[in-house]
Amino acid sequence: MLRYQASVYGDSYGNDYHLPVQGPSTIASSNGLRSQQSKIIKRPPTNYKSIPACRLAPRRRLFVADGNGVQKSMTSSSGVTFPPPDYMKKMKENYESGKIIYIRRNNPGMKGNQMTGRLTTINSSIRAPSYHATSMSAGSVTLDTSGSAPKYVYRLPKAEYGNKFDENRPASNMYVPAQEPPKQHFTTVPACMSMGGEVVFEEELDDEIADLGADELTGDGFNADKSPKSESPDPYLKSSGPLVQPCMTSKSPSYNLLQRNRLQTSRFACPQQDCFWRGTNEMSMKKHMLVHGPKQPVIYDKTGEAMKVQLVQPKPKGVKCSECDTFAYSRPLLLRHMYDSHGIEAPLVKRTFANREMLQSWLDSLRETHAVEFVVSSGSKKWGRGLQVHYLTCSRSGDQKERPNKKYVRPPRPSIKCGRNCMAYLKIKQNPTVSELQIEGCLHHSGHEIDHTRMVLESNELASIGAIVDAVNEGVDVLGNVETIRSYLGSSGRFRLVTENGLIEQMPIWFEQYHRDMAAFNGTGYRNNSGPIPITNPYLSMTMKPSINGNRRLPYSGMTIKKELESITMKKAVPIRFNGGQLQNLEMNSSIEEYDESKVKIEMDDEDALATQSILKDDFEEFKTEDLFGLGGGDDEILCGGEEASGVTSNIDGILAANLPDNFNDPLCGMDLATDFSGPFDDDVFDELLGLTNFNDRHNNLNIS
């Protein structure tokens, strides 16, 4: 038994229910028995929300009570009002005139926002999926008032079929004609490959899709059920069928909604030859063209000829190599590129410090040992879990800042920027919960010169200095040319960034550092109180060759080597050799002025005196002739009597032997040094032989005990 059936009955079930009625409409109650259908039960007006769950009723009918002769509206059993036939006639006139009619849903239960006017009587429930109407002449219309249909704004089609309306046709049989949708045209080839004259075919819609109403694809529309197609081209359908029945030749107004949900026609195509992109509007076309790069504008000069314009490309991301135009994604990848592509040593350093004080002291020491000054390149970045990362780069890395173009500009200060990216950097990781700091970076430079005075050699660099020392001891002319020195030092380390003047000026200091480290290694095993030498010292596999003229009492004299290397740089005399007391310049440059022999002799005398003072200052009592003339060695390089002495040597023994006065060379050739100098001798005689007549005075001034 039905719980409740909201039905409203009239006097007839035919077309006469459109006639003017004299009474207001009421809602009647029924227990579902056909015998009680003729009885009308008067009830007070009921709003929409007070209606019980009556939506399961098998059908609902419209009832029009007798009125005063003017029908205002029709009311369903659920309280939904519909326009009367006279309003439908007005709607027809609006349709024929091409006016736009907006159909919107009433908002039931919204108090205080009721819209006035005839437009509010049109409810979107007539567009609900479950709407199905039989012939109006049958006198019953089934409605779905669930209120689940969405709000929408709908535009009626234009009056293209206005001449087909029959004015004498009864209002109950009035139907809204459907409009033929425009056919879509597609070419057989893409627009970018079009050569003209291609075959154009019309897209045929699938019959099954065409038969479907908008309700099955979009959940909205007149057709809740499928119905057979009509072969008649007449837009007016039979009265026995639904209100609107779609077919291939007759489409419903809701077909526009179906077409709107389908893909629109591709009106725009990419002009590129290898691109098959299609679009529907101009904005999407412009957005797609950015993929192929911006279009270069055509600029014409005064004569009307096109000028070639080169647009500035965006700056690529990454770190640019200082030796080439390659960009690396990160600093560690840049170091790998420097070694693989250019053969430049770029060691990656990783260290950990307990606190900031230790890190600061280490950074201060880098200024003196590696000639590097780090500056902050960017602000700190926060990673996951509060980890902060700071990036530091070399102070000379980067380009100079552009000065603003103003009327008055201050004189620019000299900038230390080299215009390239130096590969020296530091990345500091700091954890807020832990006090230690993790360091990762590179201490070697690239792209600019470095200060040679702030450069303490590393183990591999000291090995290169040792190779030069060994070559000099073997008699190889290494110091005769700067290019030869660089060939021994190599072009992959920090030596490549030192200028020629800096290399010559710093070479004596590096020689002393080499001998100091070798002495510490052979003796105590400590290096200037800086701690023990690591086990991985490269000197363990390198044998130290003894000096040619016996055990060297003194390291290389900085003053002597400096003057020799300065003469190499000034291209005056390289090398200086003696033959029987006669000074000769074997590689004199003819373009330079004549060499002054007196100046060289004075300088050599001064160097001889200073070297002798150093020997006497070290150990005057144990002074022996072998120390002065180098007779203790197995190889004697003192050649006299017209034979050439060896080239310029960097040891003090060879310099003293080569710089003896002229009157001492001839008698020395016939002397037995072991016999003549084995006993004691007078100081005056020795001074006279060496040409140091004022030696005693100098000795007294030195106060050597």
From Swiss-Prot:
SMART domains: ZnF_C2H2 (SM00355)
Top-rank taxon: Eukaryota
Changes seen on gene knockout: RNAi-mediated knockdown reduces expression of homeobox protein lin-39 in vulval precursor cells at the larval L3 stage.
Entry keyword Cell wall biogenesis/degradation: no
GO cellular component, one term: chromatin
Span of zinc fingers (C2H2-type): 268-292, 319-342
Region of interest (Disordered), ranges: 215-239
Sorted UniProt keywords: Metal-binding, Repeat, Zinc, Zinc-finger
InterPro entries assigned: RegFact_GeneExpr_CellDeath, Znf_C2H2_type
GO biological process terms, semicolon-separated: regulation of transcription by RNA polymerase II
Keyword Ubl conjugation annotated: no
Alphabetized GO MF terms: DNA-binding transcription factor activity, RNA polymerase II-specific; RNA polymerase II cis-regulatory region sequence-specific DNA binding; RNA polymerase II transcription regulatory region sequence-specific DNA binding; zinc ion binding
Functional summary from the UniProt entry: Probable transcription factor. Positively modulates expression of homeobox protein lin-39, perhaps by binding to regulatory regions of the lin-39 gene, acting in the vulval lineage.
Protein name per its UniProtKB record: Zinc finger transcription factor family protein 17
This protein's encoding gene: ztf-17
